[in-house]
């Protein structure tokens, strides 16, 4: 398998439900699985925080749009943060000739999202 082919993610995993079974062994597929789950969890958590903010600021004329903007922001953060972290994890898995099973991809993506959310939402408490 040429190196260039291993960098192209096989997007069939997103469309035929293969993110829920099987193993990933190519660089692009591992990256796609981890980035996808990190983005999903981050987007959902930012959407929930947007609904909370919209409820708290319900007298504002922009309050109905807050969840939309926070979800878009969460998606951008999930893609960037998850993409960079998944790049490193993919390199480790490919260079070590390991297989990434479907549930390990979910665990890595959700774990990365939780680490980011802990740092994002406890930022004021962690400052010295």
From Swiss-Prot:
It is a multi-pass membrane protein. It comes from the Eukaryota. Pfam families: Tmemb_170 (PF10190). Keywords: Membrane, Transmembrane, Transmembrane helix. It is found in: Membrane. The chain crosses the membrane at residues 32-52, 74-94, 98-118. One of its GO terms (cellular component) is membrane. Disulfide bonds: none annotated. Its main location: membrane. Belongs to the TMEM170 family. This is Transmembrane protein 170 homolog.
């Amino acid at each position: 398998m040429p190196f260039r082919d291993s960098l192209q993610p096989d997007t069939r995993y997103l469309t035929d439900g293969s993110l829920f079974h099987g193993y990933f062994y190519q660089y692009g597929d591992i990256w796609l699985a981890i980035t996808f789950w990190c983005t999903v969890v981050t987007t959902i958590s930012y959407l929930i925080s947007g609904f909370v903010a919209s409820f708290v600021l319900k007298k504002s004329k922009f309050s109905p749009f807050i969840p939309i903007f926070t979800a878009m922001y969460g998606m951008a953060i999930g893609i960037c943060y998850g993409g960079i972290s998944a790049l490193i994890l993919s390199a480790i898995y490919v260079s070590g000739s390991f297989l990434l099973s479907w549930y390990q991809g979910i665990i890595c993506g959700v774990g990365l999202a939780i680490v980011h959310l802990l740092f994002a939402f406890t930022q004021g408490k962690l400052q010295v």
